[in-house]
């Protein structure tokens, strides 16, 4: 599986990253190979004068260890390209992200990018709709979190869901933004994606959710035979 992650990450960097770019760095195991490839190209001199914006403390630490030049969204608000992984992707390039806990920063950096590229292996591709392979995360305030969840359960598309407050090592997981994550589990593919997103986001106390709709420009999907499938956003 790691070999598939490496193939698709290297291809994304080689095909889309150029010198003098501001680059958004996603979070997760596949993105590690993006860092590795950027580092290789910088050290070889094939890539020059780039700065990168990490979407999590974890990515920041890994990038610093490699010596990759970093900046902030405050200093570089217009990002040329962001490369990130995903938990699920449908054929319209809509996503479920955030099972690693960095969904808010990932979404903010992606929305600030001219080009948002998703990478992953074919196990992430969901041809029958989103929400069926695992948690759909929602980041919420710690204050009044039980009331926030109560209000979320009133949303018609969430009524049949089960949920869990995310924990790590037996303790409630705290995001880089000092919030909680509540993971919702669907029994059928999410209906009315846009309406569901709107209602979740409008719930007081919700910071953001892991449903990314109409944000991805290109998806690179590595297949088990070592080839890479390229999916492009459809423009109407």
Curated annotation (Swiss-Prot):
Single GO MF descriptor: ribose-5-phosphate isomerase activity
Q: Where does substrate bind?
A: 27-30, 84-87, 97-100, 124
Q: Could you say which EC number(s) this protein's record lists?
A: 5.3.1.6
Name the catalysed reactions.
Answer: aldehydo-D-ribose 5-phosphate = D-ribulose 5-phosphate
Q: Does the keyword Isomerase apply?
A: yes
Question: What processes in GO biological process is this protein linked to?
Answer: pentose-phosphate shunt, non-oxidative branch
Q: Where is the active site?
A: 106
- From the UniProt record, give the pathway where this protein acts: Carbohydrate degradation; pentose phosphate pathway; D-ribose 5-phosphate from D-ribulose 5-phosphate (non-oxidative stage): step 1/1
Task: Keyword check for Transmembrane helix, yes or no.
Answer: no
Q: Which UniProt keywords apply?
A: Isomerase
Function field: Involved in the first step of the non-oxidative branch of the pentose phosphate pathway. It catalyzes the reversible conversion of ribose-5-phosphate to ribulose 5-phosphate.
Q: Matching NCBIfam families, A to Z?
A: PRK00702.1, rpiA
Listed under subunit, the entry gives: Homodimer.
Stated family:
Belongs to the ribose 5-phosphate isomerase family.
> Can you say what this protein is called?
Ribose-5-phosphate isomerase
Q: Species name for this entry?
A: Plasmodium falciparum (isolate 3D7)
The lineage, from the top, is: Eukaryota, Sar, Alveolata, Apicomplexa, Aconoidasida
């Amino acid at each position: 599986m790691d070999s598939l992650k490496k193939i698709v990450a290297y291809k994304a960097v080689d095909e889309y990253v150029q010198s003098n770019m501001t680059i958004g760095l996603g979070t997760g195991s596949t993105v590690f190979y993006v860092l590795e490839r950027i580092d290789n190209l910088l050290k070889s001199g094939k890539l020059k004068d780039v700065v990168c914006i990490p979407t999590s403390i974890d990515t920041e630490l890994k990038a610093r260890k490699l010596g990759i030049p970093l900046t902030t969204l405050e200093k570089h608000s217009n990002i040329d390209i962001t490369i990130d992984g995903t938990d699920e992707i449908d054929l319209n390039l809509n996503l479920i992200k955030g099972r690693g806990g960095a969904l808010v920063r990932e979404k903010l950096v992606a929305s600030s990018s001219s080009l948002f590229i998703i990478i992953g292996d074919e196990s992430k591709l969901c041809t029958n709709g989103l929400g069926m392979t695992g948690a759909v995360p929602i980041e919420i305030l710690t204050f009044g979190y039980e009331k926030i969840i109560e209000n979320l359960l009133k949303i018609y598309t969430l009524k049949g869901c089960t949920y869990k407050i995310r924990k790590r090592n037996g303790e409630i997981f705290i995001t880089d933004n000092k919030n909680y994550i509540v993971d919702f589990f669907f029994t059928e593919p999410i209906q009315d994606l846009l309406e569901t997103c709107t209602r979740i986001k409008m719930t007081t106390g919700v910071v953001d959710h892991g449903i990314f709709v109409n944000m991805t420009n290109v998806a690179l999907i590595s297949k088990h035979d070592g080839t890479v499938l390229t999916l492009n956003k459809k423009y109407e």
